[in-house]
């Protein structure tokens, strides 16, 4: 949905939500993800799994849509789907990652989520 929301604003379209968007998710800017992966390669322990996310990005899908719409100068519209369409929806309400192990390696996130979304949208506009 993240990519679809950005595609909507890049195409000068409103974001259409087909649920209340109350599910919480963790997100991560690609540069931060790459930085974390390198940090894990250099300082991580072999065989240990590390979560990568931006704790400042722990927002609901609705909040994500509103932030992206605001950056793109668009609106968020709600469309109630029929029962058949909702059968494919993810029922997980909260999917937030713990960064305890990654932070114990000394990795830190830089910048804020809104600025990173703004940067992503600007880069994509310029590449069109």
Residue ranges and their predicted role:
Residues 30, 62-63, 85-109:
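Conserved C-terminal active-site "lid" loop/helix of NAD(P)H-dependent oxidoreductases
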């Amino acid at each position: 949905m993240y990519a679809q929301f950005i595609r909507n604003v890049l195409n000068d379209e409103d974001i259409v939500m087909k649920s209340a968007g109350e599910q919480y998710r963790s997100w991560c800017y690609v540069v931060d993800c790459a930085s974390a992966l390198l940090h894990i390669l250099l300082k991580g322990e072999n065989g240990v799994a590390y979560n990568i996310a931006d704790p400042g990005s722990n927002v609901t899908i609705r909040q994500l849509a509103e932030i992206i719409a605001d950056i793109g100068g668009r609106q968020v519209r709600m469309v109630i789907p029929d029962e058949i369409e909702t059968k494919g929806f993810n029922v997980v309400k909260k999917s937030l990652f713990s960064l305890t192990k990654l932070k114990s390696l000394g990795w830190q996130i830089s910048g804020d989520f809104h600025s990173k979304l703004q940067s992503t949208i600007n880069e994509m506009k310029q590449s069109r």
